[in-house]
Amino acid sequence: MTVKVGIAGVTGYTGGELIRLLMNHPKAKIVAASSRSNVGNPVSAVHKQLYGYMDLIECEMKAENFAECDVVFLALPHGASSGLAKELVSMGKKVIDLGADMRLRDYDTYMEWYGAEHHWPEILPDAVYGLPELYRERIKSQDLIANPGCYPTSIILGLAPLLKKGWVKLDSIVCDSKSGVTGAGKSLTQNTHFPDCNDNLSAYKIAAHRHTPEIEQELSALAGESLLVSFNPHLIPMNRGILSTITMQAAKTDLTQELLDAAYQEFYANEEFVRVRNKADLPTTKQVQGSNYCDIAPVWDPRTKRIIVVSVIDNLVK
């Protein structure tokens, strides 16, 4: 059976990457694509590497233009997808929202951090957080999936085994994350302008990044109690990839490197796309580029009684 797929917001970096993945999928066929800036023109007019390979004409971003689809991906900025998602689900479509509109379960939290108009706030408590390593069975049965953010994916997967074990002092988690420039999207800003980001490493939105409540929401669910994190993102001069270095104080007094390695190997034993490394083979962004892998290495520091976790993903895929 071929799944007929639509993409709303196809002109961005995420939309382009989605085309690559779907065109190489044996059971998927892209039948509709839309944007606000390229209506009436072929997708290849923006993603020029697709010239002669995929020349589907982009349609207006209206729900009825996706009537033929079984699944619709929304690759839209925050505030732009909730209304369209509501219409599509009412038409019986499965919707996967790659943006931020459906990730937070609490409407007030969404308004505090995003401040954008939300056209379907009543659905937020029921939207499934689309991290298959944690919510696989729910994802299978739901029509609305909230795709996780890029920073949160690297951090949540990096910490999940420890929080499930109760090995972490919950008030001690510090997340230092570095992202390639595509994580900022296609809209040009001073920070992403080539002369400014090339040969430059910069911190931004320290203690104020919008992914913070998403990280805290999912880590709190894993820990079974509310927690806060210190999240410190940085922009690095490369196109794609995220590396998160997460440090925390251990709650377990007799922890060893062997116990740490075993806990991660056990937790991710059946996960095809999580690869557990070790402190002698720390993961790098180049190792996961273009892939769906998350590579993780936990490290025990007996001198400071701290746990350090290195987690890497490709922000345009995983």
Positions of the model-derived regions?
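Predominant activation on well-ordered alpha-helical scaffold segments within soluble catalytic domains
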Residues: I19, I156-A160, T212-E216, D261, ...
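Short acidic/glycine-rich loop or secondary-structure boundary segments that cap or lie
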Residues: S154-I155, T182-K186, M238-I242, L255-Q257
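Oxyanion-binding "anion nests"
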Residues: A208-N239, L243-T245
